[in-house]
């Protein structure tokens, strides 16, 4: 079949992105029909605990969808709790924030769950945190998870402030989560910027990047993110591939097998040995 470049039903092409600080276009109040009402999803953990996820009714930033990448990386953390237990975690583009909630339940030291600083989206993230019975606390300051607004590529200081004082040379998060963000091709550079700004420069620190190519004809553009990360000096490794029973958006065009496939990758700083090897090969 031909490979159209136009917008498909659910995942827009965004090469003229307006995701800038304060950069959502404003339209007259009656320009669009009323937004759909908020929705609710449920995620059942392996021990039977239920996490209720509230989502906004509609968002131009796709925050109204529980994406497959969020579910798959949450399941991965349950199978490998050592990846998040006693570690600091930052999720960007989180929407409902499922992976962050799971990381917090699994004993992360501190989780900062973020999305675009739209009040409705941030309120929903807080609602999901406060509504999770496994994360109940007597005092807000005792929580190991907080929600905040963040624009990709923006200043890291407000995010790092949630971690309190850190040792010199150890600023940053142990774990970053990027779930189903790569379809926004024009934002790849800012996503890599965020990894550079916020990932702790320490062995074992890594960004988990999990995604599906929802537009199979643009898969090469999704994967270009990893080329950019390598150009910036990061080491990229594939760690996961899962085939879902059906595509998230069943009626969308494109190869169904690709639309059912979720892959996971880690992006990390090189070790001293890897730096030396790269220098020797140059």
Curated annotation (Swiss-Prot):
Task: Tell me where it mainly resides.
Answer: cytoplasm
Which N-terminal stretch is annotated as signal sequence? Answer: none
Location of the region described as Disordered in the Swiss-Prot/TrEMBL record: 1-32
Question: What are its GO biological-process terms?
Answer: methylation
Q: Which UniProt keywords apply?
A: Cytoplasm, Methyltransferase, S-adenosyl-L-methionine, Transferase
A Pfam family assignment? Methyltransf_16
The record, for PROSITE patterns, names: SAM_MT_NNT1
What is its subcellular localisation? Answer: Cytoplasm
Binding positions (S-adenosyl-L-methionine):
67, 93-95, 115, 152, 179
Report the domain of life of the source organism. Answer: Eukaryota
* GO terms of molecular function: N-terminal protein N-methyltransferase activity; protein methyltransferase activity; protein-lysine N-methyltransferase activity
Q: Which GO terms describe its cellular component?
A: cytoplasm
Record EC number: 2.1.1.-
- Give the compositionally biased regions (Basic and acidic residues): 1-13
Family in the record = Belongs to the class I-like SAM-binding methyltransferase superfamily. EFM7 family.
Q: Which HAMAP family match?
A: Methyltr_EFM7 (MF_03223)
- Report the protein's function: S-adenosyl-L-methionine-dependent protein methyltransferase that trimethylates the N-terminal glycine 'Gly-2' of elongation factor 1-alpha, before also catalyzing the mono- and dimethylation of 'Lys-3'.
Q: What is the official name of this protein in its record?
A: Protein N-terminal and lysine N-methyltransferase efm7
Q: What organism, scientifically named, is this protein from?
A: Neurospora crassa (strain ATCC 24698 / 74-OR23-1A / CBS 708.71 / DSM 1257 / FGSC 987)
């Amino acid at each position: 079949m031909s490979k159209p470049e136009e917008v498909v039903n659910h995942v827009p092409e965004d090469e003229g992105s307006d995701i800038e600080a304060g950069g959502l276009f404003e339209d007259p109040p009656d320009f669009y029909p009323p937004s759909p009402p908020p929705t609710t999803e449920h995620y059942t953990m392996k021990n039977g605990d239920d996490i209720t996820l509230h989502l906004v009714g509609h968002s131009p930033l796709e925050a109204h969808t529980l994406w497959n990448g969020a579910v798959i990386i949450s399941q991965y953390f349950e199978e490998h709790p050592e990846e998040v237990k006693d570690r600091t975690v930052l999720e960007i583009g989180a929407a409902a924030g499922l992976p962050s909630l799971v990381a917090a339940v699994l004993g992360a030291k501190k989780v900062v769950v973020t999305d675009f600083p739209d009040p409705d989206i941030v309120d929903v993230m807080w609602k999901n945190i406060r509504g999770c019975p496994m994360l109940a606390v007597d005092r807000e300051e005792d929580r190991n998870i907080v929600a905040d607004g963040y624009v990709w590529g923006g200043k890291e200081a407000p995010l790092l402030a949630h971690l309190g004082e850190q040792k010199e040379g150890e600023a940053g998060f142990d774990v970053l989560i990027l779930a189903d963000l790569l379809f926004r091709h024009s934002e790849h550079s800012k996503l890599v910027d965020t990894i550079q700004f916020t990932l702790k420069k320490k062995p074992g620190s890594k960004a988990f990047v999990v995604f599906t190519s929802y537009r199979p004809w643009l898969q090469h553009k999704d994967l270009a993110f990893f080329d950019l990360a390598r150009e910036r000096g990061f080491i990229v490794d594939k760690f996961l591939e899962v085939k879902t029973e059906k595509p998230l958006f069943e009626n969308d065009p494109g190869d169904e097998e690709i639309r059912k496939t979720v892959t996971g990758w880690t992006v990390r700083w090189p070790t001293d040995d890897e730096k030396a090897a790269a220098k020797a090969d140059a």
